[in-house]
Amino acid sequence: NTMRAFQSLGVRIDESAEELRIYGKGLWGLTEPSGPIDCGNSGTGIRLLTGLLAGQDFFTVLTGDESIRRRPMGRIVKPLREMGATIAGRKGGELAPLAVTGSRLRAINYTSPVASAQIKSALLLAALFAEGTTRVTEPRLSRDHTERLFQSFGIALRREGSTLLIDGHPSVGWSAAPRLVVPGDFSAAAFFIVGATIIPGSDVTIQQVGVNPTRTGLLDVLTRMGADIQLLNQREEAGEPVADIRVRSARLRGVAVGPDLIPQTIDEFPILCV
């Protein structure tokens, strides 16, 4: 869905069995799509695209499947409107489809009510098109994939405690990454990690998994429960920590999971309950 969305915005993407070749068009190079962009079941996709398109000089409609059209969008629409974005949607912009009319954006100081990488990332993308320095403050650190990717492309970010600062209209420092290797998804690996932990006699190694510390709360919880988990061959790819995860079966004990671990464990709670 993300690839089709950018193709509809005029980006050339060549796909082969093992890689995508993307021909960048620069900050202002996207073009108005001929119809609505369908984000399917991707909440991340529709929210990040809303931020990206808020500063463009054309009109876009973003929609998704039935479940996406029921999910709340107000948490990104409200701060984007504060930046000057023109966004309309069902229930005053609370629900998709969202109609985004590109506008001249201005920097804001925004304090997010929740630790949300989707809110943060939508605002960081919009901030690239805004006049001035945008500040985004979170109550706790959320996933930082966007910040790491920005920095790998030479986009300057600064952190002051729980606040991120980014300057709009960056004119220097950009660099095209000749090759990005996307590590294995930790949420997908979580099922094998738990399975190997609870099935007697297991000894499993899962290779090339992203182990970003803002994503791996499950490892912290399982280790406290007595799991036998090792991170091998640790390295960094495109700013992201990567490792091979070796898991051997172990007897576990119950633990209490506090609010400090919720953001980095949220997607793994169903399998953690097993």
Map each language-model feature to its residues:
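Structural preference for solvent-exposed beta-strand-turn elements
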Residues: 1-274
